């Protein structure tokens, strides 16, 4: 059976037992990402800024009304959290295939590869949050007590991402074209999340508007904006629902991963 009575999730025990391997992998992911580049880790700041500039140029009139007078801050507070999701899910989906060599030679809990992807993505996200703070101060938003919710929202997003990539990475070992499908869905997913547009644009959009408002990433992105821009507490009921959903996806993802990992060596 898929779910055996008495079967336990050992993911947290694995994190503790293999913490040194996890630290090594996270450091390798972060350093390897910009290895050989002249600017090194500074690209963690430059990449989001370049993305913001592109969208600022491409959508100068269409979206300028979003977020009030400061669309630039509105854009940054949505784009950086979305980039965390996009890059980590993309890398996580191919993580098992990318590490086929070590998987065939060395035993260790394979989920460590996915956890390290999420942690390295989280570190890069936190570095990029410096950009958000800089722009918030530059445009007069400052900082408020609501910033205490930043680690909570980031943790919920990280758990959600981990659950998703546990499923996708294990399926990707068996389904050759899955990573390309995921890439397409992620591209479409940005437009199903209010990253570059205001939710008010969906007023009167009917079912589509309701679906986008119920999107867990919509709630997460708007929670970041509540923290950085609006200085109000995120909607705890909705955020709690996303946290519960993230935990459910994590449990399902772990079960799927452990079920399918037995065939990784043969499929890779």
Feature-to-residue mapping (PLM):
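Hydrophobic transmembrane alpha-helices and immediately adjacent juxtamembrane helices
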Residues: 1-268
